[in-house]
């Protein structure tokens, strides 16, 4: 199994970039993550960088790590860092851990993981937000999340309390061929049909991401958010 991937992070029109990301290979496994520091709290960029740095260290020490447990430990570490620095810094995080047997997808907050098969979405992580709650209650459609007034109000984030747990989904490696991991600043500007169309028309991860980045750039003026994405293609052999 081979991994082909590309990534980027853009400040948008904000004063600073509070997004962080990770892509790392080791012993035939790959881990990738995107974290989006909460802008309403001091130290969002510190929180997101802390989360991905800690995750990378754990992966480098053990490529077969328990992703859910690792995120629980990172959450505890972030709470400790809050006390040390005197800042209530918080962050979203979504991550995938791919090995020969399967793929583990984990998310906390409203950064997203998409899995694609034959240019169609076969899996999408669920946001932890007030807008997603409205979807669950049947008050708005999933597409309505992008324009909902409470889209940025999260119901779960790293650093918000001690007993935070990620949503964990295990994917069979044969069930998908491509992955997209991104912050809300990215998926807010690129709708799902555009993701699929860009993938269908691309030969490489770089082409796929480049097309979507242009689409995101065309829409980003609406909220000026940081936007970050990692794309991965899985190849046999």
Functional labels for PLM-detected ranges:
Residues 1-237:
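PP2C/PPM-type serine/threonine phosphatase catalytic domain
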């Amino acid at each position: 199994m081979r991994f082909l991937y590309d990534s980027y992070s853009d400040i948008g029109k904000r004063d600073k970039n509070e997004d962080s990301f990770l892509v790392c290979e080791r012993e035939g496994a790959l881990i990738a993550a995107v974290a989006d520091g909460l802008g309403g709290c001091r130290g969002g960029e510190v929180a997101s960088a802390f989360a991905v740095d800690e995750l990378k260290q754990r992966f480098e020490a053990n490529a077969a790590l328990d992703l859910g447990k690792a995120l629980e430990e990172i959450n505890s570490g972030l709470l400790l860092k809050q006390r040390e620095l005197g800042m209530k810094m918080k962050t979203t995080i979504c991550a995938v851990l791919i090995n020969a047997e399967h793929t583990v997808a984990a998310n906390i907050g409203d950064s997203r993981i998409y899995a694609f098969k034959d240019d169609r979405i076969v899996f999408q992580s669920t946001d932890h937000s007030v807008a997603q709650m409205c979807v669950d209650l049947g008050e708005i459609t999933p597409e309505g999340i992008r324009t909902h007034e409470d889209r940025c109000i999260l119901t779960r984030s790293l650093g918000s309390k001690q007993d935070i747990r990620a949503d964990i989904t295990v994917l069979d490696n044969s069930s998908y061929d491509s992955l997209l991991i991104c912050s809300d600043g990215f998926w807010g500007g690129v709708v799902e049909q555009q993701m699929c169309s860009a993938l269908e028309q691309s030969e490489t991860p770089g082409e796929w991401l480049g097309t979507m980045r242009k689409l995101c750039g065309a829409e980003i003026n609406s909220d000026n958010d940081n936007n970050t994405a990692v794309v991965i293609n899985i190849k046999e052999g």
